[in-house]
Every structure is written in C-alpha cells, then in structure tokens.
Regions:
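Arg/Lys-rich, low-complexity, intrinsically disordered basic segments
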Residues: 1-89
Length: 89
C-alpha cells in the first residue's frame, strides 16, 4: 500500500479507518465499514492515480466513474466512491 492510498483513506474516512490489501481476486483494497462488513474496491489489474500520477488519465477515469448509474453517490462506502476518493485523488 503506497503512502497516497493511506493518506487519501484517512482524509476521506477519518484517521481510524481500517484499510488492508484485498483478500478477493482482482481487488486492490478492502475497507471496514461501520456495520462490520468489508467493502472491496479497485482492480489490481490496472494502475490508478496513486500509482501513475497522470492527470489526463485521472480526468478520463473520473469522467467515466462519475457517470455510473445507481445509488452509489449516497453510500460513502460504495466501491465506486472509495475508488474515486482513495485511488483517484
């Protein structure tokens, strides 16, 4: 886990956030939700902004991710929200 991931997770979810490398295939990280369940996010087959620091790729990813349909915007722990705020900031 690189320094940006932990820093972004603390900024988004607070200093007491529990984030670990994922135990699920093809997922990068898992975050413990208040209900005691884990939320898995990020695809370990692809780089994210915390790895490549390419602003153009960040802009393109965020344009795609923010247009995903569904109720993910109201769930702070949705995989899409976690990816946007932790892996792409």
């Amino acid at each position: 886990m690189n320094k940006y991931v932990l820093q972004n997770a603390r900024n988004y979810l607070g200093d007491d956030v529990e984030i670990k490398p994922s135990t699920r295939k093809f997922k990068k990280y898992m975050v413990l939700k208040p209900d005691g369940k884990w939320s898995y996010f990020g695809d370990n087959r692809y780089e994210d902004y915390t790895q490549h620091r390419d602003d153009e790729r960040k802009k393109n990813y965020l344009a795609r991710a923010k247009n995903i349909k569904g109720n993910w915007k109201n769930d702070k722990y949705s995989p899409n929200n976690l990816s946007i705020h932790i892996l792409w900031q």
